[in-house]
């Protein structure tokens, strides 16, 4: 807001009137290309002990589809052209209105402004549309998942270095994990002691999820061979391997892996599956797989299991605060009931 007010409106934020702010939200919803970057960048960088402006920083970061980014690299196209037509999503606009409203509340409380015009502007906003819409969960199809798992297994059979690829891919999908929950962080380092068995013989994995909330995720029997396979591989590499060793370790160096490193591992499995699907004639499914991200594994596992497990159990394993969240994301029972009853209507 400050940057726009100074450079575009030529005013201080305390001089902005309602028409000015409405123009600002129009601007934010569809910003000009020079204001949009192709990746998230820090505004300042520490160079030689001094804070310097980062020339790559832009106020907005366009979300470039993975397939478009890869295609641009293959064709040698400037990825900058892919920013055209960028608009903020409904959720992003909601956050924008809320942030600016809080800012004007502060200015009012401190005596810089004479009131907060944002609530009135938000009421008339064309960018905030009320109403429920059915969410499309981004997940792998059953065929895509079969290829991903099969290719990861084949790679591990051919080269032990891919044992980690197989373990990470199978674990993220089967336990509905966010990639951060398997990564090494400043406040949490997943180790083999977090994989444990209770007195009834049930297996669990302790993870630190969103909001620094600890939970135990139930481990299905089908995943146990993959865990044991990776454990034996790790034990063969080092005599010091034990319960305090990192759950997912680097091939070189010590310690666990970052989220970025784990995403690269999963991408290896996706790339192998993509090539095999194309070679076997599944061009459409292969093309869709190029859009897949690591988080799709979480959605894939949950979507496959939601019909056969109690909602409460799914919510607990997913780390959702309420069953309502799980229902809204994966079941959407209200939408399905409405669709079922609506099918019998006459023309």
Q: What are these language model-derived features?
A:
Residues 87-90, 147-179:
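Basic, Lys/Arg- and aromatic-enriched nucleic-acid-binding interface segment
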Residues 184-229, 235:
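Conserved tyrosine-mediated DNA breakage-rejoining catalytic core shared by Y-recombinases
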Residues 316, 328-347:
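DNA/chromatin major-groove-contacting recognition/catalytic segments
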Residues 1-135, 155-156:
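N-terminal core-binding DNA-recognition domain of tyrosine recombinases/integrases
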Residues 263-316, 323:
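Short, basic (Lys/Arg/His-rich) helix/loop patches that form interaction surfaces
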Residues 128-150, 212-222, 238-243:
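DNA breakage-rejoining catalytic core of tyrosine-based enzymes
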Residues 101-105, 163-184, 205, 304:
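Short pre-functional
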Residues 209-229, 243-269:
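C-terminal catalytic core of Y-nucleophile DNA break-rejoin enzymes
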């Amino acid at each position: 807001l400050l940057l726009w007010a100074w450079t575009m409106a030529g005013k201080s934020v305390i001089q902005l009137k309602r028409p000015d702010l409405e123009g600002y939200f129009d601007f934010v919803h569809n910003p000009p290309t020079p204001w949009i970057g192709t990746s998230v960048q820090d505004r300042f960088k520490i160079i030689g002990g001094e804070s310097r402006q980062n020339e790559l920083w832009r106020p907005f970061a366009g979300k470039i589809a993975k397939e478009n980014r890869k295609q641009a690299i293959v064709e040698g196209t400037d990825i900058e052209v892919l920013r055209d037509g960028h608009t903020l999503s409904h959720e992003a606009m909601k956050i924008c209105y809320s942030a600016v409203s809080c800012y004007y509340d502060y200015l009012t409380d401190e005596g810089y402004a004479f009131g907060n015009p944002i609530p009135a502007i938000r009421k008339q906003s064309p960018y905030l549309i009320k109403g429920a819409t059915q969410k499309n969960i981004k997940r792998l199809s059953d065929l895509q998942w079969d290829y991903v798992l099969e290719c990861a297994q084949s790679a591990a059979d051919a080269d032990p270095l891919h044992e980690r690829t197989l373990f990470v891919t199978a674990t993220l999908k089967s336990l509905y994990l966010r990639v951060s929950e398997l990564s090494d962080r400043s406040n949490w380092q997943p180790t083999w002691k977090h994989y444990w068995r209770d007195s009834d013989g049930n297996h669990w994995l302790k993870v630190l999820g969103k909001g620094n909330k600890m939970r135990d995720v139930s481990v299905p029997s089908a995943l146990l061979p993959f865990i044991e396979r990776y454990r034996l591989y790790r034990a063969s590499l080092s005599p010091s391997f034990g319960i305090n060793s990192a759950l997912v370790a680097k091939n070189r160096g010590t310690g666990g892996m970052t989220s970025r490193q784990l995403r690269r591992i999963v991408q290896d499995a996706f790339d192998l599956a993509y090539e095999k699907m194309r070679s076997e004639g599944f061009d459409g499914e292969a093309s869709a797989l190029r859009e897949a991200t690591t988080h799709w594994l979480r959605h894939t596992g949950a979507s496959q299991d939601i019909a056969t497990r109690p909602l409460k159990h799914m919510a607990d394993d997913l780390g959702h605060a309420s069953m309502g969240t799980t229902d809204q994301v994966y079941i959407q029972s209200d939408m399905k009931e409405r669709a079922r009853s609506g099918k019998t209507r006459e023309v």
